[in-house]
Amino acid sequence: MSDHDDVIVMLCTAPSLAVAEALAHSAVSARVAACVNLIDGVRSVYRWEGAVCNELEVQLVFKTTRERAEALRELTARENAHEVPELLSLPVDHG
């Protein structure tokens, strides 16, 4: 990950620390992320199936590249416990 233009941060949440740790280990082991930060105790408020939900979750912050983003999307879709996992991609300007 030497070219900063290629580096991105991808964010998703997991319903528990166990699920988040498993996702982080899978992503790093599969080399689709260089590093993953886990932020436990994130509260998410969202609408799902007509109801407003208020849940504690774990925020995952993946450091990866544009080249590996699709493989990371596939991994999180396959291994996240959420029915529709969120995965946001953000460019890195400096770091």
Where are these regions (language model features)?
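Positively charged, small/polar-rich N-terminal and surface patches that mediate targeting and assembly
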Residues: 1-95
